[in-house]
Design a protein with these regions (language model features):
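A cross-family "folded-core" feature that marks the main globular domain of proteins
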Residues: 1-241
Length: 241
């Protein structure tokens, strides 16, 4: 079989199929016979993932860590065969590359000689490894922007109820928050951290509004499927204030 179409979608399908094969009692036989995946290739990927776990001080779930080495071997083959993610991520790339987690994973990959030449592949591989704790991996880079805007509108409606104030120029506010929360989605969803923080002086100035915003972010947390850290709520508060 040959896969055609958007490379990210193709990889999502390969990941789904890999998961399904792993559920079979003949999984290793299928991988070895039909895809010629060698035990040494799998062991190299497992070693790399264990090093990432040590570097990040995390432990990935058993089912993901079983599937991941096989998917990573297939991913490496696609990249070597010229199937590259062509999307350009602009500010999103900078948001991810500035994180401590990205630096740690790149350090491990470079040390093992596994670092792709393409920066978009750096991002893809980094986010895939970080996402091993997440259930739905079908679209690592994608998010539903319409759904995000809907949840921003719900957040603003809740904020207006909590403050008993009608906000001005809500359309522009929604647009600004959508632009900010797109890269924030990846920081929050994958638990990414950086050395950048707001100063205590700025936080103190925002505190009166911060607590109201914090009490209104439930719709956004529903979208992210994660609790929003206080530092991210402070950044959201800056847009409101």
């Amino acid at each position: 079989y040959y896969f055609r179409g958007d490379e990210e979608a193709v990889r999502g399908l390969i990941l789904v199929v890999t998961d399904q094969v792993m559920d079979s009692i003949y999984n290793r036989l299928i991988f070895e016979k039909y895809l010629a995946i060698q035990a040494t290739e799998i062991e190299e990927q497992r070693k790399m993932l264990r090093m990432v776990e040590d570097e990040l001080q995390v432990q990935y779930t058993d089912n993901r860590i079983q599937t991941a080495p096989y998917f990573l071997v297939l991913l490496d083959r696609r990249v070597k065969n010229g199937h590259i993610i062509e999307q350009r991520f602009g500010l999103l790339a900078k948001e991810i590359m500035d994180t401590n987690e990205y630096a740690a994973i790149v350090k491990v990959l470079a040390g093992q000689g596994m670092l792709p030449k393409s920066y978009t592949e750096h991002l893809y591989l980094c986010l895939y490894i970080l996402s091993l704790k997440i259930t739905d991996l079908s679209n690592i880079f994608s998010l539903n922007k319409e759904d995000l805007r809907k949840h921003i509108e719900l957040f603003i409606a809740m904020l207006e109820r909590n403050t008993i104030i009608q906000l001005n120029d809500k359309e522009q506010l929604i647009e600004n928050l959508a632009l900010h929360l797109t890269p924030a989605y990846y920081r929050i969803r994958y638990g990414l951290t950086s050395d950048y923080t707001l100063t205590d002086i700025v936080k103190n100035q925002l505190d009166p509004l911060f607590f109201i915003v914090k009490s209104s972010v439930a719709p956004l947390e529903e979208f992210f499927e994660e609790r929003i850290p206080n530092d991210e709520i402070y950044l959201i508060t800056m847009f409101i204030g």
